[in-house]
Design a protein with these regions (language model features):
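Membrane-interface helix/loop caps of multi-pass membrane proteins
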Residues: 1-190
């Protein structure tokens, strides 16, 4: 059985409630109270989830690489199954219902969004379109798939980097991971 980390559970709880309260108070602001400013940054809870996921996945991979029990194919198979089964069902439902209720031009756009969701490039598509919080974004049923795309991209890249570091720096693997992470953080702020 997996060991639970209370500190990470606490961060997840804060992230969940910050997103929920953000949406709740945003709804109040747009419908009832125009001066409500509580939880304006609550959407950052999504970023916290990305960080937590990255931390946990990298930690798990590093741990398995240290014991030579990491299987890249098995890792990808589990992730693809976990992510793509519900995503494909959701996309099929959206396309089916959309066929009957959407205008043809919006349906075509939705079809393109479905394609981007499936090939994990929705984050690029939506980053180059309307703002996430703009009124036009209300028409984008798959706008939330930017998160799934980033997650998939991370799952594709992270294990390959870690496996490569393990092969290159056999004896100093943990140090190489630390140095790589440090360099990555430095470049993120430059």
């Amino acid at each position: 059985m997996k060991e639970t980390r209370k500190d990470i559970d606490f961060l997840k709880t804060i992230a969940i409630f910050s997103v929920i309260f953000y949406h709740f108070f945003d709804l109040l602001k747009s419908n009832l109270l125009s001066s409500v400013t509580l939880f304006e940054g609550g959407f950052l809870g999504v970023d916290v989830f990305l960080l937590i996921s990255g931390f946990l996945i990298c930690g798990s991979i590093v741990s398995k690489l240290n014991t030579d029990s990491f299987n890249l194919l098995q890792f990808y198979t589990r992730r693809v199954t976990r992510i793509y089964q519900p995503l494909l069902v959701f996309c099929a439902i959206i396309l089916f219902i959309g066929y009957f209720i959407l205008f043809p031009d919006i349906y075509k756009e939705t079809g393109r969004e479905v394609a981007n969701a499936i090939i994990a490039t929705a984050n690029f598509r939506f980053a180059n379109s309307t703002g996430y919080f703009d009124l036009e974004s209300l028409d984008k049923v798959l706008l939330h798939t930017w998160y799934i795309a980033i997650t998939i991209q991370f799952y594709l890249i992270c294990p390959v980097i870690l496996v490569s570091l393990k092969k290159i720096f056999k004896t100093n693997f943990n140090l190489s991971v630390l140095l790589f992470t440090t360099l990555l953080l430095i470049t993120a702020f430059v």
